[in-house]
Amino acid sequence: MIIPIRCFTCGKVIGNKWESYLGLLQAEYTEGDALDALGLKRYCCRRMLLGHVDLIEKLLNYAPLEK
């Protein structure tokens, strides 16, 4: 869905790092190197980006108000 603004465990702001993370992955960084470059050292914050599935574009195809 939408990337969480803060880490669920420690509360660090991570929402502003999603676009940068995707850019680093496009630039052939590994997942671990991209997270290190963004300054995400705690495993709780790292899992927030690694485990995120971006489904918002797919869900917009199923607007319930349109008939």
From Swiss-Prot:
Specify the domain of life of the species encoding this protein.
Eukaryota
Chief site of localization: nucleus
Task: Please give the InterPro entries that the UniProt record associates with this protein.
Answer: RNA_pol_su_RPB10, RNA_pol_suN_Zn-BS, RPABC5/Rpb10
* A Gene Ontology term for the protein's cellular component: RNA polymerase II, core complex
Write the record's keywords in alphabetical order, separated by commas: DNA-directed RNA polymerase, Metal-binding, Nucleus, Transcription, Zinc
Q: Where does Zn(2+) bind?
A: C7, C10, C44, C45
Q: Which GO terms describe its molecular function?
A: DNA binding; DNA-directed RNA polymerase activity; zinc ion binding
Checking Pfam families in the record gives:
RNA_pol_N
Annotated GO biological process: transcription by RNA polymerase I; transcription by RNA polymerase II; tRNA transcription by RNA polymerase III
Cellular compartments annotated: Nucleus
Functional note? DNA-dependent RNA polymerase catalyzes the transcription of DNA into RNA using the four ribonucleoside triphosphates as substrates. Common component of RNA polymerases I, II and III which synthesize ribosomal RNA precursors, mRNA precursors and many functional non-coding RNAs, and a small RNAs, such as 5S rRNA and tRNAs, respectively. Pol II is the central component of the basal RNA polymerase II transcription machinery. Pols are composed of mobile elements that move relative to each other. In Pol II, Polr2L is part of the core element with the central large cleft.
Q: Which family does it belong to?
A: Belongs to the archaeal Rpo10/eukaryotic RPB10 RNA polymerase subunit family.
Give the quaternary structure. Answer: Component of the RNA polymerase I (Pol I), RNA polymerase II (Pol II) and RNA polymerase III (Pol III) complexes consisting of at least 13, 12 and 17 subunits, respectively.
Name of the protein:
DNA-directed RNA polymerases I, II, and III subunit RPABC5
Q: Which organism is it from?
A: Drosophila melanogaster
List the lineage, top down: Eukaryota, Metazoa, Ecdysozoa, Arthropoda, Hexapoda
